[in-house]
């Protein structure tokens, strides 16, 4: 009985670790990265990537929930998304 109580306390006292999505880059993690942020972020939407109205319904849930980051330079706002596959 004492063993169950100790095991339960250990399990609930550990910090909650969430599985990070491959697309998930927190801004703090990007800021602390040793390489330039351009290695992690690319402009969104990508240049040359054309949207097809017929294919919009077939997008995967992962791409729909993709995180976007905004950088404001003067009056212009730039959106970035994590780089994948490089």
UniProtKB/Swiss-Prot annotation:
Protein name as catalogued: Neuropeptide precursor capa-1
Disulfide bonds, paired cysteine numbers: none
Superkingdom in the source lineage: Eukaryota
Organism ancestry: Eukaryota, Metazoa, Ecdysozoa, Nematoda, Chromadorea
Organism from which the protein derives: Caenorhabditis elegans
One function term, GO molecular function aspect: G protein-coupled receptor binding
UniProt note on tissues of expression: Expressed in two pairs of neurons in the anterior part of the nervous system (at protein level).
BP terms from Gene Ontology: neuropeptide signaling pathway
Function in brief: Encodes at least three neuropeptides: two of the periviscerokinin family (APHPSSALLVPYPRV-amide and LYMARV-amide) and one pyrokinin (AFFYTPRI-amide).
Signal peptide range: 1-19
Keywords annotated in UniProt: Neuropeptide, Signal
